[in-house]
Amino acid sequence: FPTRRSSDLQAQIALYLGRAYVEDGEYDNAMQIYADALQLAKEHQAYNVAGYICAYMADLYGFRDITSERLEKRKEASNFFKKARNYKSYAYALKDLACECTLTDSFNCTIPLLQKADSISQLLHNKDLTADVANAFGVIYEAQEKYKNAERYFLKAIETGSKESYKDSISLLHIYIKDNQLAKAHEWIETITKHNDIAYYFNQAYYLLYKAEGKYKEALHYKEICSDMLDSLTLVQNETKVLEIEKKYNNAKIREENE
């Protein structure tokens, strides 16, 4: 009979195999692998692995727009992570569950879920988790057109200094534009520290702002900058791939010469 440890390992292997099928677009095979792995994980109380499997199954249902099943798997994932005492993943699962609820306009359940996730993030002192939960608050309040609340939480996400804070800066800009606070939008862009690695997002921000103001000439200018930056990025990526191929070829040639 398989031990609990070996069953946990088997479930993990199946989890990675399922993800590989998803990347290849073989969703039916992936779902079958996930279902078998989940059954194995539950039988041997491998709750942490079961949580991840449910989370990936929820993602897969999302690809197929099956909302009810996706919501159910988000609930299962959060319960399994709680049983496993993996509180970081539990908080993320609660956050994901809250976001799923918005798809069915179930806003009443979203705030309590996010409040619980936020409490956990404060106990764990995890700034990325805190920022993600604050971002979720912002997104949900934005969907309800409660722009003041959305602004407050996007600012909270930015203040954490997480690696994704620049995205929250863009989300906050969207709030100002939607709320017709265009002067504040200008002020916000000017106060943002401009780093080279996120220059694209700020040029995109100017494009969105000028478009909202009806200044289409200026908007077109910044849109063209964004297009040029994307073209340059594609060129660099292609050149990198060529260099990698050349390197592999040269290494293979050297090995042949030495044999």
Feature locations, PLM:
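Short, small-residue-biased leader/transition segments that mark boundaries at the very start
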Residues: 1-6
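Residue register of alpha-helical TPR repeats
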Residues: 12, 52-53, 92, 132, ...
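Hydrophobic positions within repeat-based interaction scaffolds
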Residues: 190-259
